A protein has these predicted regions:
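Flexible, surface-exposed loop/linker segments and immediately adjacent secondary-structure boundaries
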Residues: 4-42, 46-48, 54-192
Length: 192
């Protein structure tokens, strides 16, 4: 269970573009550069929106891109101190300090990713394309990460430069890291 005082900030907004909304226990409304981010805040970026923030305790930088919805969580009270991000839709990039040995957990509708000292990209798509597969794409840019599929309970360990798709139907699809989306579409069609 993630726990933190509702009124204490856990991150600081470092950049915004376009419309970025916040729904939380402490504040609601537009997010601006310099604003604190609180435990439990839901951040919503619009069509042209972008926001980045730095977690105060472990100096992890999180970048949230257009048309995304995330919830920011932190646990400082347990001996397993860590930050969490729940991704409901859209795309995020997480840049962890290589020296940071605390876990960062990203929860998506299809998988739970756990990383430490890693730089990675995650995108959740609920487009129901490719035989009704909704999926989450994980790419490790530097470091290592574990991804567990929520439905199947199976885990995969990823290294630098690897990309994997986790579907809500319980499958993992390994990909070459592509420069365009046609490779993703072709791999998804081959899997079915």
């Amino acid at each position: 269970m993630i726990g933190f005082s509702r009124s204490e900030n856990i991150a600081l907004c470092t950049e915004t573009h376009g419309v970025v909304q916040r729904k939380g226990n402490v504040r609601n409304g537009i997010v601006r550069k310099g604003d604190p981010i609180y435990h439990g805040d839901k951040l919503i970026t619009g069509e042209d929106g972008f926001v980045s923030f730095m977690n105060i305790y472990e100096k992890t930088i999180v970048k949230i891109y257009e048309n995304s919805v995330v919830k920011v969580l932190s646990d400082r009270k347990s001996r397993f101190s860590r930050s969490e991000l729940a991704l409901f839709g859209g795309k995020v990039i997480v840049e962890m300090d290589e020296q940071n040995d605390r876990d960062f957990v990203l929860r998506s509708p299809s998988a739970i990713a756990t990383a430490s000292g890693t730089h990675f990209l995650t995108e959740y798509r609920d487009e129901l394309l490719y035989n009704n597969l909704s999926y989450c794409i994980f790419t490790v840019l530097t470091g290592k990460m574990e991804v567990e599929n929520i439905k199947s309970g199976h885990s995969i360990f990823m290294d630098q430069g690897e990309t994997v798709i986790s579907t809500r139907e319980g499958k993992f699809l390994l990909l070459d890291t592509f420069r365009d989306n046609s490779g993703i579409a072709n791999t998804l069609m081959e899997a079915n």
